[in-house]
Swiss-Prot record:
Pathway: Amino-acid biosynthesis; L-proline biosynthesis; L-glutamate 5-semialdehyde from L-glutamate: step 1/2. It comes from Pseudoalteromonas translucida (strain TAC 125). Keywords: Amino-acid biosynthesis, ATP-binding, Cytoplasm, Kinase, Nucleotide-binding, Proline biosynthesis, Transferase. One of its GO terms (biological process) is L-proline biosynthetic process. The gene is proB1. It is found in: Cytoplasm. Belongs to the glutamate 5-kinase family. PROSITE patterns: GLUTAMATE_5_KINASE. Its EC number is 2.7.2.11. This is Glutamate 5-kinase 1.
């Protein structure tokens, strides 16, 4: 990064920075981050904050020998969230707003658009959005699971220029620096593949739920949307000075030269498939043809229940995941079409309503 030319950024702050001793919020490291936010805003940069730490912040409000069951963690999150927001708010002389999200909010397209509109409106009026996963109410099927991936989804939804993930390490190393003295910090990653994930190892924070692997997953989500992604050390004051000077103090993951379109990115990285269709071997040729669509005679089977507009998985007969797509038909109607693809009624219905899957509503998945 040669110069600071951000228009809008997302900052992800982990639990270890919020509550380093797991005993409530501490301002030791947060003050420096708050100052960085103030300075960014002074330069005309819009900031969105994704802040972990509600469980760690609320833990001290309960007896120290309390077993951390799932229900107790939810209670700690509920109590700690108010404490954490109050801590952030006291550092600023401008308003902030709390948004608590679940994966269900993000994977539902209508709610996803609502989140975008809310964030844009807050930014337009100079309000700092502070976002966290709603750990107090979320269930396993609605969890993002970590705020690294949540921050990438938020960055994509907000059309951010950069995602800054503040960690307890300087960036991505070629091997674990805690085990290898000769580990080398990698300042720039041009593309993410299996070799990059192999460098992540399996380390996780003692306070939070994420590790280097989830940060790379977040970088993959963000860079595919054209968002530069940084993994940097949030415990060092010099990190923020160098960022404001236009330097790279950690590891930068470069964005795709040709980012995914918004709808394709949402289907690929955020939406959960509600069902699936099995297609025959003509799938690739159909997409390469003039119409770029999938018709009923190419559907071999339909699994699950889904409605028009739901995201579905497209797979081959051997189980290969080929694509995600928006369903133009309900599962019930699509099953009828698949079973009666040669019927005159089926053909007329597709001529009237459209193909089973159209090119503009499909996101191809990489074949492994």
């Amino acid at each position: 990064m040669n110069k600071l030319n951000w228009r809008r950024i997302v900052l992800k702050v982990g639990s270890a920075l919020i509550a380093p001793d797991q005993d409530g919020c501490r301002s030791r490291y947060i003050l420096t981050i708050a100052q960085f936010i103030v300075r960014c805003r002074a330069r005309g940069i819009e900031v969105i904050l994704v802040s972990s730490g509600s469980v760690a912040a609320g833990a001290h409000l309960f007896p120290s020998d309390t077993a951390r069951s799932v229900v107790m963690k939810k209670a700690m999150a509920a109590a700690g969230q108010t404490e954490m927001i109050a801590m952030w708010d006291r550092f600023f002389d401008f308003p902030s707003a709390q948004l608590l999200l679940t994966h269900g909010d993000l994977r539902d397209h209508e709610r996803y658009q609502s989140i975008r509109e809310t964030v844009f409106t807050l930014l337009e009026h100079g309000v700092l959005p502070i976002i966290n996963e709603n750990d107090a109410v979320t269930t396993d099927d609605l969890k993002v699971g970590d705020n690294d991936n949540l921050s990438a989804m938020v960055a994509a939804a907000a059309d951010a220029d950069a995602l800054l993930i503040f960690s307890d390490v300087d960036g991505l190393y070629d091997k674990n620096p805690n085990l290898h003295d000769d580990a080398i910090l990698l300042p720039e990653i041009k593309s993410i593949d299996d070799s990059i994930y192999a460098m992540a190892g399996c380390a996780t924070s003692a306070v939070g739920t994420g590790g280097m692997k989830t940060k790379i997953e977040a970088a993959e989500k963000a860079t595919s949307h054209g968002i530069s992604t940084y993994i940097i050390n949030g415990f060092k004051e010099e990190t923020f000075t160098r960022l404001l000077a236009g330097e790279n103090p950690g590891t930068i993951f470069l964005p795709y030269e040709k980012p995914m379109q918004d709808s394709v990115h949402w289907m690929t990285h955020t939406a959960n498939e509600q069902g699936e269709v099995v297609v025959d071997g003509s799938f690739d040729k159909s997409l390469e043809g003039e119409t770029g669509c999938i018709r009923g005679d190419e559907i071999m089977a339909v699994h699950g229940e889904f409605a028009i507009g739901d995201t579905i998985l497209v797979r081959s007969e051997d189980g290969t995941r080929l694509a995600k797509a928006t369903a133009n038909y309900s599962s019930c109607l699509l099953s009828f079409i698949a079973d009666n693809e040669q019927s005159e009624f089926s053909e007329k219905m597709q001529d009237s309503i459209g193909p089973v899957i159209s090119e503009k509503h499909i996101a191809l998945l990489e074949k492994s």
